[in-house]
Design a protein with these regions (language model features):
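Glycine-/small-residue-enriched transmembrane alpha-helix faces in small-molecule transporters
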Residues: 1-39, 44, 78, 86, ...
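Helix-loop interface residues and adjacent transmembrane-helix termini in multi-pass membrane transporters
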Residues: 30, 93, 119-121, 178, ...
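C-terminal transmembrane-helix exit sites in multi-pass transporters
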Residues: 51-52, 106-128, 254-274
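Juxtamembrane helix-start motifs in multi-pass secondary transporters
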Residues: 36, 181-185, 245
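Membrane-interface interhelical linkers
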Residues: 1-17, 45-75, 88, 121-127, ...
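Hydrophobic transmembrane alpha-helices of multi-pass small-molecule transport proteins
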Residues: 48, 74, 122-144, 162, ...
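Hydrophobic alpha-helical transmembrane segments of multi-pass membrane transport proteins
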Residues: 17-21, 25, 51, 74-93, ...
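Small-residue-rich packing faces within the transmembrane alpha-helices of Major Facilitator Superfamily
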Residues: 20, 45-46, 134, 190-194, ...
Length: 292
């Protein structure tokens, strides 16, 4: 661990590879989106449980969580469940590049929500970044419109996935002031897993009807995308600025799209690439503004 503390860039690279695997693994799943997402969250909760209950500090904190924090964590888990379902479903209808790029606009939606509901400030430069990101999304939609209605539907699902994860992030800003990251994420992931299991039940989908491949994909998503992805980036905040960590996450669409090009033959067109550059550039610019 001391070696990694001296060379934290290694963890940045691991984090990028971890989150970039998510879209690819989802594509390999033959199960419905709700089932794949449910397995990911069930494995995540299972892997996190020994950490939470194995440490007295976290165990005591979990048992002393007040009603407001618990309720907000459940609501946050509902929106996170919607995010996973919508994004996984999006990947069944549009390209990996389009889906991952559009989901990256979550930062923009967080800023809008912060301004609208939490009385945050939104500068003129931030508004310009949002406008450019919107233009990029329109360009991707135009590029995908030539591929058929299913691709546009996938783009819309990715946009809704970005908005729902933004709500999850906004609730986190409120709750995190009174609870540790470990306990908060455990509460949210547990609620998220429960919601996804209910979705499977309502849709009449069995968790065990799609073979061991789906179970394994869920485990790999939990390990790579959650633990070696998002959790690693949280660790990196100790050594890098928030803007650098945010900018590093923007490598996800690039790496995912590159893997999709080799694995699925998905080669982005010129308009799609241009829209992607506008979105990623505007999100990077906004992340720099946030850091200042």
């Amino acid at each position: 661990m001391k070696y990694l503390e001296k060379h934290p860039m290694i963890m940045i690279v691991i984090g990028i590879l971890g989150i970039s695997m998510s879209a690819i693994l989802v594509r390999f799943s033959s199960a419905p989106s709700a089932v794949t997402a449910a397995w990911r969250l069930c494995w995540t909760v299972l892997l996190q449980t020994p950490v939470v209950f194995g440490k007295v500090q976290f165990r005591r904190e979990l048992m002393s969580v007040n009603r407001k924090t618990a309720l907000l964590s459940v609501v946050s888990g509902v929106f996170l469940a919607l995010h996973f379902f919508l994004w996984f479903e999006s990947l069944q209808h549009t390209t990996v590049a389009s889906s991952t790029i559009i989901v990256c606009t979550e930062v923009i939606w967080v800023s809008l929500g912060f301004w609208l509901f939490l009385k945050g400030k939104l500068s003129g430069k931030a508004v310009a970044a949002i406008a450019v990101a919107f233009l990029g999304s329109v360009m991707i939609a135009l590029a995908d419109s030539g591929m058929g209605g299913s691709h546009l539907y996938g783009d819309l699902l990715a946009l809704l996935a970005a908005i729902t994860v933004a709500v999850y992030m906004l609730i986190g800003r409120i709750v995190r002031s009174g609870v540790s990251t470990t306990v908060y994420t455990y509460l949210v992931y547990t609620a998220c897993a429960a919601v996804l299991l209910v979705m499977c039940l309502v849709q009449g989908q069995s968790m065990v009807a799609y073979g061991m491949q789906t179970v394994l994909i869920g485990l790999l998503l939990a390990l790579f995308s959650t633990i070696l992805g998002h959790s690693v980036f949280s660790w990196c905040l100790k050594y890098f600025s928030p803007s650098f960590v945010s900018a590093s996450k923007l490598c996800e669409p690039v790496v995912s799209a590159t893997m999709a090009a080799f694995l699925f033959g998905e080669i982005p067109g010129a308009l799609q690439l241009a829209g992607g550059v506008l979105i990623l550039g505007s999100v990077f610019y906004y992340a720099r503004l946030e850091d200042k």
